[in-house]
Amino acid sequence: MLQNCAQSNCRIIPKKLRDMKREEICRLLADKVNKLKNKENSLSGLLPDVRLLYGETPFARTPVMYEPGIIILFSGHKIGYINERVFRYDANEYLLLTVPLPFECETYATSEVPLAGLRLNVDILQLQELLMDIGEDEHFQPSMAASGINSATLSEEILCAAERLLDVMERPLDARILGKQIIREILYYVLTGPCGGALLALVSRQTHFSLISRVLKRIENKYTENLSVEQLAAEANMSVSAFHHNFKSVTSTSPLQYLKNYRLHKARMMIIHDGMKASAAAMRVGYESASQFSREFKRYFGVTPGEDAARMRAMQGN
C-alpha cells in the first residue's frame, strides 16, 4: 500500500498520477479502518490515545464539542463553523485542536464514501520528551499560534505514518511495541509543519495561549460552579478587557458563551449516554432553572432535550 513510501520521491511523479495514487491509498486505508472498528475495544487498552472514526451517515450542521487532538481523515469530510470562520478537513487537510472547543460541524458521509479516519489524543509528556530531543535546533522555528483550532495539509509523511499505525493495530504485539513510536512520529511531523506553533503552545508557559489554556482547564474542572469573568481573568493574571480579547482569539467566543456552551454539551452527554433526565442534568451542570436550561438547549441544539435523546435512540436502533 504505502510500503517504502518514506523512500519515494513524490516530487518527480506527475501530479495527476500522484493524486490518483493517493486517492487509491486513502480508499484502502478507509477500508482498513472499517475492519479495525470491530477490534477497537481491545485496541483501546494497547493504544489509549488512538480512536478510530467510521460512519456512513451524513449529519447536518449541528453543535459539537471536541477535546484536544489530531484528526486525520482518509475518506469523507467535515466542515466546521466558528462564527465567521469556516474550515474543511478531509483526506487532504488534517485538523488540530489544542483546547476543548465547542463549534458547529457538518458531516459528509455515505455508504459509498464513508467518513473514515483516526483521532490522536496529544500526550503532553510524549510531546515534552519530543521537544527535549529536538532541543535548540536552528531548523525548528514554529510560528506562534493564536487559535485553538487549526487545519493544515495532510502531508505524505503524516499519511505514511498513519498507514503504518493502522497496520500495526492489526497485530496486538506490534500495536503495543511499535504504536507509541509511530504516534510520536506523527507528532513530530505536525510539530515541524504549519501547525507546529499550535502544538508547541500546549507546553509553553506564560504565553497568552497557555494562560487561556489554563483557564479552560479550570472551566473543565469547575464548570458546575458559579464562575465569573473576573475570577477567570484573575486566573489568567490579566485585566478583564485583555482576558476577553485573548480568550476570544483562542476560542472564537466570549468567556461566558464558552462556559454556557460547555455546560450544555456536558448536560447533553449526561442525557444521551447516562439516561439522565433533563432536569437532573441541568442541575448537575450548574443550572438553577430547568426551564431556562430547556430553552437554552433548544436554542443551541435546535431541538428539546427529549427530542434529542429520542433521535439518538432511534439512530442507535438502526
Curated annotation (Swiss-Prot):
GO terms for biological process: positive regulation of DNA-templated transcription; regulation of DNA-templated transcription. SUPFAM superfamilies: Homeodomain-like. Keywords: Activator, DNA-binding, Transcription, Transcription regulation. Disruption phenotype: Deletion of the gene confers sensitivity to glyoxal. The knockout strain also shows higher susceptibility to glutaraldehyde. Pfam families: AraC_N, HTH_18. Coiled coil: none annotated. Residues 230-251, 278-301 bind DNA. It comes from the Bacteria. The keyword Transcription applies. Residues 213-311 form the HTH araC/xylS-type domain. SMART domains: HTH_ARAC. Induction: In strain LY180, expression is induced by diverse aldehydes, including furfural. Induction may represent a response to physiological effects of these aldehydes rather than direct binding to YqhC. Probably regulates its own expression. GO terms for molecular function: cis-regulatory region sequence-specific DNA binding; DNA-binding transcription activator activity. InterPro entries: Homeodomain-like_sf, HTH_AraC, Tscrpt_reg_HTH_AraC_N. This is HTH-type transcriptional regulator YqhC. It comes from Escherichia coli (strain K12). The gene is yqhC.
